[in-house]
Amino acid sequence: ADAGVDAVFFDCTNGSLTWQPEAGVTLAGGMAGEKYFLYYPYQETAKMAGKVNATDTTSDGDFFATLINDWQPEADQSDYTQGYTASDLMTATGSGSKADGKLSLSFSMTHRMALAVVEMPKTVYKFTDTSIPDYVIATTADFSGEAKPCRNTDGTYRYFVRPGQGNTVTLTGSYADGKKEFFITPNNISVSSYKTYKVDGAPTIDKDHNLQVGDYLLADGNIVGKDETLTEEQKASVIAIVFHAGHHENDASDY
C-alpha cells in the first residue's frame, strides 16, 4: 500500500478487521504487486519516523523490523488500555481482493513480544448445597516497583516483555497482607509465546462451606460464616451480606 497511508483502525471484538484509511485516501485494490501492512497499537506519525523499511516488503517482519527491534513494553501495564494493550506489538501483512467494487483485506496478526503469565494460589469454596456451583477466588497480589502486570479476568496477572534473554525487568509482588513475597524475572520466552510462573506452586485450597443467610462477603472475595466472630480487619473489609429473596422452605406467606 502507499507508504503515506500510516493509520488504520481495526476492531477485533467480533474477530474481524476493518480498514479505515485516512480522509481523502482511496484504496484502489487490484494493482500489480501491491501489499498491505498493518501494525498495532497505533503510534503517532512522529514516533514512526524511521521505523518502517519501505523497500523491504518480503514480510511484515522485514517491513517493521526496526519498529520491532526498538519496541519497549510499558513498565506499568496494570491499566488494560494504557499499559497492557499498549505494550502488545502486533504486525501483519495482508492481501486484498476486490468484488462488486468493494475491496476486502485479510490479515493475520502476529504478536511480536512475549508474555509472562503469573498464576496465584486459589481458594475454592465447595458448598454443602451441591446445587450451588463451586466458588473460586484467585489470590490478589500487590506489586511494588515500576513493573506492574495487568490482572486478567481469570485471576492471573499478565505482563509483556521482549522475547528471548536479557530482560532485566523483575516483578516484585506480595500477598497475604504482605506476609508472603515473590520475585519473577521473565526470561527465555519465545516471540509470540507465553510462559506461566506459579507463585509458591499456585496451590488450590479447598474449603467446605455451608452457605447461609447472614454470611459475610469480604473485599478479597472470601466468605466468613454468620456465626463466626469477625476480626476488626474483617469488619472493615465486609462488602456484602448473603440474603434470600423470594420464598424459602419456612416461608408460608402468599406474596
Regions found by a protein language model. Give the residues of each.
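Short, low-hydrophobicity acidic/polar segments
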Residues: 1-116, 121-123, 185, 190-201
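Short, surface-exposed loop and linker segments with low hydrophobicity and enrichment for Pro/Ser/Thr
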Residues: 26-33, 109-111, 153-154, 159-165, ...
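Short, surface-exposed beta-strand/loop "edge" segments at domain boundaries and coil↔beta transitions
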Residues: 26-27, 44-50, 125-128, 167-168, ...
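Generic structural hydrophobic/aromatic packing signal, biased to beta-strands
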Residues: 38, 118, 159, 171, ...
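Contiguous ligand/interfacial binding patches
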Residues: 79, 129-193
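A broad structural signal for short, well-ordered beta-strand segments within beta-sheet-rich domains
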Residues: 90, 124-133, 242
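Short amphipathic beta-strand and strand-loop transition segments with alternating hydrophobic
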Residues: 94-98, 148-149, 241-248
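Short, compositionally biased
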Residues: 174, 188, 194-196, 200-255
